[in-house]
Amino acid sequence: MNLTEGRVVFEDVAIYFSQEEWGHLDEAQRLLYRDVMLENLALLSSLGSWHGAEDEEAPSQQGFSVGVSEVTASKPCLSSQKVHPSETCGPPLKDILCLVEHNGIHPEQHIYICEAELFQHPKQQIGENLSRGDDWIPSFGKNHRVHMAEEIFTCMEGWKDLPATSCLLQHQGPQSEWKPYRDTEDREAFQTGQNDYKCSECGKTFTCSYSFVEHQKIHTGERSYECNKCGKFFKYSANFMKHQTVHTSERTYECRECGKSFMYNYRLMRHKRVHTGERPYECNTCGKFFRYSSTFVRHQRVHTGERPYECRECGKFFMDSSTLIKHQRVHTGERPYKCNDCGKFFRYISTLIRHQRIHTGERPYECSVCGELFRYNSSLVKHWRNHTGERPYKCSECGKSFRYHCRLIRHQRVHTGERPYECSECGKFFRYNSNLIKHWRNHTGERPYECRECGKAFSHKHILVEHQKIHSGERPYECSECQKAFIRKSHLVHHQKIHSEERLVCSMNVGNSLAKTPTSLNIRDFTMEKVYH
C-alpha cells in the first residue's frame, strides 16, 4: 500500500518566484515569504504529512529554487543523507530556510535552524547533521533571536506547534498557552488530540495552535495583511502572498485585441470570449448562453432553487460562495476595502467605488433627455421618471401612485394612522420627521429663515416666502369677481366671502330690506379690504 497516496505534500502548497520576480521584493516581502512557507509547513506537519515510514524521504530534500540561482537542489545546504524525522527539528524546515535569500546576505550564505538554545548543543557547520539527545526539552519560555553570522540561524522553537509568525524574528515573551513536551507521553497526547485548543466562541477544538490562532480570525474579523499596491486586506498571510504575485509576476500572455496581459494562458483564452462574443455554455431550461462555466453553474441554481451555501451565524442560504462571503461581513463587521482619500472602510468593493466618486467628482451617468449628470445609476433612474411621468409605486388602499418608494411609505401613514416621530419635550407625535423638526423650533425658539431685506427671522420657510412678497409687491392671488389681488391665499379666501354674501342677500329677494342695510355691508367690505390689502 502506498503510504503517500492522497497526501498533500509541501510541493503542492509551495509558492515559487523567478529570479527577476524575487528581485522586485523588498525585505519585508521576503521575510513574509519565509513566514508563509513556515506556516504551510507547520500546517502540513500538524496533519502528519512528514511523520510516516522511517525510510520515507522528506519532499523538501529534493530542493527547489527561490529566485537565487546559486542556491539550488544541486547544492543542498544540509547533508544530502536521509535524516529520520525523529532525529531533527523537521528536515523540510531547514531546507526552506536555507533557500530563502535574506536581504543584505550574500547568496552563498544560508539560513539554518538554531538548535543550540533548543537542544543545548553547539552550532553546527554547513553539511553537518544536527541531532539531539533522548532527553530533549524545548524551552518555550526563552527569548530567541536570529543569529547573523557566517551561517544564519533561525530558532524554530516548537515549530510544529507555534504559529510561524511568532518564530520569525523574535519571540515576544513566554508562551504560556503552549506547554513543552516533557516526555514521550506528552507528545503522544498532543498527537492523539487529548490536549486540544478550544475556541471559546464556537466550541471548535484544534490540535495545532497555529490552526487555532488562524481560526480565531474568523470571529474577530482580523485582517492583518494589507497590500501596499492596491490596499486590499487579507486574513491569512498565505492568501496575501498569493495575491502579491498579481503585482510582481510577469504577465506573458497578451491579448492582441486590447493589449491586456495575463499570467496564465487559460485566463487569456477565457478573456478572448469578450472580443469574439463566444458563449459556449447553454442553459437547457431557458436557452440562455453564458461565457463562463462558473456563471452558467450559478445561473442553473435560479431554476433548481438550489442554495448550497449556508451562513452558520443566521442560517441563511445562498446560491454562490461569493454572496455568502459578502453576507458574513454583516456578522463579523469586517470592512476590507479602504478609501485612500479619507481612510473610510467599506464592506463591499462596489460601495467603495461609489464612494470614491465623491472625491473624484465623477458623474458617469447622463440623462439622454436633458443632459444632466449623476453620480449613481439609481439617481439617474429616479430622475428619468420626471421625463416619463412613470409612477411605479401604487398605494393598495386608495390607488394613488408615486414616483419614489419613500413617498409611498410616507403616504401610507395617512391610512395606518402611524405617527412614528415623537417630540421629547411635549410628547406630541408626528407623521413625518420634517414636521417634528418644524415643531421642535417652537420649543427652541429657533428662527433659521431670515429676510435679506429687513432682517426679520422666521421659524418656517413658507412664512418667509410670504413675507418677502411685501417687499417685492407681488400679489399672486387675484379675485375672479372684482380682480383685486392679495399677497396671501388666505386673504383671498376671506375676501371672496364678501361676494358670496352679496349673492346670498340678492337671492333672498328681501326687497327694501336690502336698502336698509347698505351701511353694514359697506362697512364689512371696507373692513375686509383694509385688512387684506
From Swiss-Prot:
PROSITE patterns: KRAB, ZINC_FINGER_C2H2_1, ZINC_FINGER_C2H2_2. Keywords: DNA-binding, Isopeptide bond, Metal-binding, Nucleus, Repeat, Transcription, Transcription regulation, Ubl conjugation, Zinc, Zinc-finger. It is found in: Nucleus. It comes from the Eukaryota. One of its GO terms (molecular function) is DNA-binding transcription factor activity, RNA polymerase II-specific. GO terms for biological process: regulation of transcription by RNA polymerase II. GO terms for cellular component: nucleus. The keyword Coiled coil does not apply. A zinc finger (C2H2-type) spans 197-219, 225-247, 253-275, 281-303, 309-331, 337-359, 365-387, 393-415, 421-443, 449-471, 477-499. Gene3D superfamilies: 6.10.140.140, Classic Zinc Finger. Residues 8-79 form the KRAB domain. There is a cross-link at K516 (Glycyl lysine isopeptide (Lys-Gly) (interchain with G-Cter in SUMO2)). PANTHER family: ZINC FINGER PROTEIN, ZINC FINGER PROTEIN 281-RELATED. Belongs to the krueppel C2H2-type zinc-finger protein family. May be involved in transcriptional regulation. This is Zinc finger protein 548. It comes from Homo sapiens. The gene is ZNF548.
